[in-house]
Curated annotation (Swiss-Prot):
Belongs to the universal ribosomal protein uL6 family. PANTHER family: 60S/50S RIBOSOMAL PROTEIN L6/L9, LARGE RIBOSOMAL SUBUNIT PROTEIN UL6M. SUPFAM superfamilies: Ribosomal protein L6 (SSF56053). This is Large ribosomal subunit protein uL6.
Length: 176
């Protein structure tokens, strides 16, 4: 059995409902509905969730660990939420959040406007910082990757959009 799949999930004040092949996790920040793989059994035991594979096949063992991680992320998302911080490095690089849009000035001849999907918010504490927040970990990471993709950090000066915890290794310039 998967080592990840063995450990129970503490619900931390979230409500869980199991119905027709899907699990609904409800918390103070919102609700996430996730389909449950048929190779995994889910049991709710007084504030904890236990997952077990249906049989001892490799696929069922692997899916029990995967489903445990997905459900644990859903519980964390609806109780505490997820956030990803981005930093803009470069002269004239600016960001501004306006409602469900993120306006970026990244050295192009035109401003870049990124439309935020439903359930994901962007905040700009300063002009060179972006904080992306939401309850769905996958969605928050995807939006952060899309914003970073507009101008990834280049290897010579490090200019571009980077994650706040990202370390950009700079190359040395060509010498005569």
């Amino acid at each position: 059995m998967s080592r990840v799949g063995k450990s129970p999930i503490a619900l931390q004040g979230a409500e869980v409902k199991l119905a027709d092949g899907a699990i609904t996790v409800k918390g103070p920040l919102g609700t996430i509905t996730q389909p449950v793989n048929p190779l995994v059994n889910v049991a709710n035991n007084d504030g904890t969730l236990n997952l077990a594979p249906v049989n001892e096949s490799r696929e069922a063992n692997a899916m029990s660990g995967t489903m445990r991680a997905i459900i644990a992320n859903a519980v964390h998302g609806v109780t505490k939420g997820f956030e990803r911080k981005l930093t803009l490095v470069g002269v004239g690089y600016r960001a501004q959040a306006q409602g469900d849009k993120l306006n970026l000035s990244l050295g192009f001849s035109h401003p870049v406007v990124h439309q935020m999907p439903e359930g994901v918010k962007a905040e700009t504490p300063t002009q060179t910082e972006i904080v992306i927040k939401g309850i769905n970990k996958q969605q928050v990471g995807q939006v952060a990757a899309e914003v970073r993709g507009y101008r990834p950090p280049e290897p010579y000066k490090g200019k571009g959009v980077r994650y706040s915890d990202e370390v950009v290794i700079l190359k040395e310039t060509k010498k005569k």
